[in-house]
Amino acid sequence: MSRPQRLTSSSPWDCSGGVFDWDAALRKLDELNARVEDPTLWDRPSEAQAVSRDRASLAARVGAVQELEGGLKDALEYAELADMEGDEALLEDARAQLKDLKDRAGRAELEALLSGEADGNDCYVEINSGAGGTESCDWAGMLLRMYSRWANAHKMSVELVEETAGDQVGIKSATLLVKGANAYGWLKTEAGVHRLVRISPYDAAAKRHTSFASAWVYPVVDDTIEIDINPSDVRTDTYRASGAGGQHINKTDSAVRLTHIPTGIAVACQAGRSQHQNREEAWKMLRARLYEAELQRREAAQQALEDQKTDIGWGHQIRSYVLQPYQMVKDLRTNVETSDTQGVLDGDLDAFMGASLAQRVGATRDA
């Protein structure tokens, strides 16, 4: 594979800050290409998969820079031609192209920050309602929809692997499996407690209510990562899957819950049609949870995973969503805020995720 041509225009990243060093990236890509072409590497399948994954990730980032710079060159030439001809319609097209390039460059810059060990992995998003009955269950259901919409907007696949319905509306808990490039890297910034303030549609007196729900995010563990679990440390429970019913409702005890006794970590799966399918997926979820706990222990700048999981209430919020008496979504970690509450609930989360990601990287560098 030939070495990519050195770019002549400035990179969209601040290379001096160490976010994306172009020369170092090309040298690393050369090294990874050479390793992949070494036939002896494939005698070690796990290592070969890891190297191939790293090469694909870096090649995508290098390609993104080249694609953006090529697009910028074309758009500027297009704008210059439109200006020479005095064609306002062509100029408007050129402006739209430049805006699109700016948006893509901004996202690519943020993705360059996704350098954590598991950032490129798929992930599970676990949502739980807090105290508050109907209101909190409804709010948890709104979060489930919000994250599903965000993932779909970014061409990621979403699978509901577990859901416990609320007594009247919404959900008590649910787990999503999100598959896509850097799914964990992006969604890990959403872990924490989310607070909703609104006039309740379920209160005949139309009083304002405050509700809480939590989101916790765990990376999917692929075959190149070894997580040792002693089967005797895991308790298995089976139960009947819950849901809306219908012709596909499972009338056997096909749902599976696994509890890791030493840590108390529990996972459940009921999406499969058989107990075997649910057991297999539950084991994947348990490995993800234990891997995330290990990652947290390695990060001195963050608390351990189980230390984060305190009461879902006032003192542990990451974001506040106020729908009445005014409209405002504010991230309490970064102070990023917007009055477009509906846009946020429809999955427009990039500004919040980007600011939180940049803050995390900054804290790590300052540590």
UniProtKB/Swiss-Prot annotation:
InterPro entries named in the record: PCRF, Pep_chain_release_fac_I, Pep_chain_release_fac_I_sf, PrfB
Pfam families: PCRF, RF-1
Primary localisation category: cytoplasm
Localization (cell): Cytoplasm
Modified residues (N5-methylglutamine): 247
One Gene Ontology cellular component annotation held by this UniProt entry: cytoplasm
Entry comment on modification after translation: Methylated by PrmC. Methylation increases the termination efficiency of RF2.
Role according to the record: Peptide chain release factor 2 directs the termination of translation in response to the peptide chain termination codons UGA and UAA.
Name of this chain's protein: Peptide chain release factor 2
